[in-house]
Amino acid sequence: MSDSENHESSEPGSPARSGRSRRKRKSGGTRNAQYWMVVSSPDNFRKTREHGFSIQGLKSRHRRRVETMRVGDRLLYYVTGRMGFAATVTVASPMYEDHTPIWRSSRRDEDYPWRVHIRADFVLDEADWVPAKELAYRLDYVRKWPPEHWTLAFQGHIHALPRADFSVIEDEISRSSRRRKTLAV
């Protein structure tokens, strides 16, 4: 192989061999955590709870998103039907593929194959879930939709959230958790 076949062109502005331009990674290889919202049915949230909040599977069509998840990323759970925020967790492993049935979908062939191990941060009892309606007006993410259609922000399965929005929701989940502990004393 000649040198020209071995190395990509080093001239500024020249395209990479694949025809796509390539971005250089910042040295150090670290990045800030990403923040995600998992939209889950009550049954699938229950399945995650039954597994001790140790694993989360995501739908097959979301492989690219899940591939960007890293250890230390944060997930929060929005539960449909109840329209409430129920828990926050931290991603504890890189993505892997597993077709063992745990979660259910209306699509018969969906087995949530893209999985990450997780570690629970805050988990609320169902009676303490934080209603999304109470927080929606405070979330930048929700402002993409007209106010009368705020619930559209919670359609789909996995969404990237701004850190500030995640913090607003997690603070309310934490407050709800502390309220429950105070009432129990």
Question: What does each of the following model-derived ranges do?
Answer:
Residues 91-159:
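Aromatic- and Lys/Arg-enriched surface recognition patch
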Residues 78-84:
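Short, charged beta-turn/beta-strand-edge "cap" motif at the junction between a beta-strand
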Residues 2-71, 165-168, 173-185:
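Compositionally biased, charged N-terminal/linker segments
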